Amino acid sequence: MLLQAEHISKTFGAKRVLDDVNLGADSGQCVALLGGNGAGKTTLLRIVTRLVEPDSGSILFDGHPLGQADLRQVGYLPEERGLYRNMRVGEQALYLMRLKGLGRREAEAALRSWMPRLGMDGWWQLPTRRLSKGMQQRLQFLVSVAHNPRLLILDEPFSGLDADGAAMLTAQIQSLRASGTAIILSTHNLQAASALCDKTVQL
């Protein structure tokens, strides 16, 4: 099992958000995380990416405790937008990729090889402030996958996408899964979950 999160619990104030939750994904597997608003989906994904510490439980990556070095092998698409409006698309993508530890030349080559696959030809010089919500989603997906992570975590990836954007994203997720990437995604879209994933976890 590539990722094993076991007995995860988390409380914020008086609210118990997660209570003894288990989540796992292996290479080439897609796991859908289901649940209503407030069920703890985003909190669990943020715990798996070490953005939030659990109150209890363990997270193993490839058989050992998940550490900072392992996070370079993880791609994360957050539900909230974390983009700088005054940057251009290419500049912004390079900045975010370099935060993952890639050199400028390596990062730019990776980004430029991925952009045509996401329908982003000609986007390099676009101001980020001109991007629609769906275009912002494509940009953040680009940054989450361009470094070829072994584990891809997607929080509501279809949010803000039109039909064409959703179809493109579905095709890319299927391709990544076929190439051996482990994928965990949260979604309200049961049709997408059943089409893409072979396992579901209900919160």
What are these regions (language model features)?
Residues 34-36:
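The feature captures the beta-strand-to-loop junction immediately N-terminal to the Walker
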Residues 49:
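Helix-to-loop junction immediately C-terminal to a conserved catalytic motif
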Residues 57-70:
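Conserved ABC transporter NBD signature motif
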Residues 94, 98, 106-123:
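Conserved ABC ATPase "signature" region
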Residues 152-155:
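Catalytic Walker B motif of ABC-type/P-loop ATPase nucleotide-binding domains
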Residues 163-165:
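Helix N-cap at the start of a conserved alpha-helix in ABC-type nucleotide-binding domains
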